[in-house]
A protein has these predicted regions:
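A short alpha-helical cap/connector motif
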Residues: 1-187, 191-245
């Protein structure tokens, strides 16, 4: 990595070079559109949870590269809810890519933000240290019973799944099952990756999870070009999923 002074000098030079028409479009239209789509998801969740209050507990985030969604969650929820925010990430980038998750955009080690860098970004954004917890490690190793018991019995108000890959999403969904309560919103950030193939990625992991647990009742919530959200309604076997917060 280049020293920070050289990086800043290079950025200054780049800012003085005229943008191409394509670069101007990406900066002016495409990037703000992607940001606004995700912001719409968070505002919709805030509206839903406020109308249906109280739904309290955790904001659980699986995949926290660059702290973008964590900071957006804080901005969207802090004025209305007393959530505790939990970032669960390898902080080493993507794991080794299994055959079922092959797509050109995914590479082992890609999308890496270190834990200290993540925390610095969040704290500079105004998130208090006592409202934010991190859990480090790849999900097939880090989502243990000990970690689960560390956070229970409090439930989740929001679960944000941004782990990209089918093989990463499987352990995430099994982990969060115990944190569901009536009104929990679960969001899939990469719902339409893998060409929206229902047999790939987060779509497949979600379908198989629902097939394994038919007693869990979810309803469609909101969607964008890439994200999809559901609401947990309750247990079909008779429980309503209400829990301690």
């Amino acid at each position: 990595m280049l020293p920070s002074g050289i990086q800043e000098f290079a950025r200054g030079i780049r800012r003085r070079i005229p943008l191409t028409e394509a670069e101007r479009w990406v900066r002016r239209d495409y990037t703000p559109f992607a940001f606004e789509e995700r912001a719409r998801i968070f505002r919709s969740i805030a509206r839903f949870l406020h109308i249906n209050r109280p739904v309290t507990g955790y904001y659980l985030e699986f995949g926290s590269h660059e702290a973008n969604t964590m900071r957006m969650a804080w901005d969207s929820f802090r004025h209305l809810f007393d959530f505790h925010y939990v970032a669960i990430d390898s902080f080493q980038g993507l794991p080794k890519i299994g055959e079922i998750d092959r797509q050109d955009i995914w590479e082992e080690g890609k999308l890496c933000t270190g834990e200290m860098q993540f925390l610095e970004l969040c704290h500079k954004h105004g998130m208090p240290a006592d409202r934010l917890t991190t859990v480090r490690g790849y999900y097939d190793e880090s989502l243990t019973e000990d970690v689960k018991n560390r956070f229970l019995p409090k439930k989740a108000a929001v679960v944000y799944v941004d782990c990209d890959l089918y093989l990463s999403t499987i352990p995430v969904l099994e982990f969060v099952k115990n944190f569901l309560q009536q009104g929990t919103v679960i969001v899939f950030d990469d719902w339409n990756c893998f060409w929206a193939d229902p047999n790939r990625g987060e779509r497949r992991a979600w379908r198989e999870f629902c097939e394994r647990h038919p007693e869990l009742h979810f309803e469609d919530f909101v969607a964008t070009s890439m994200q999809k959200a559901f609401v947990y309604v309750g247990d079909r076997s008779g429980g309503n999923g209400k829990g301690s917060a």
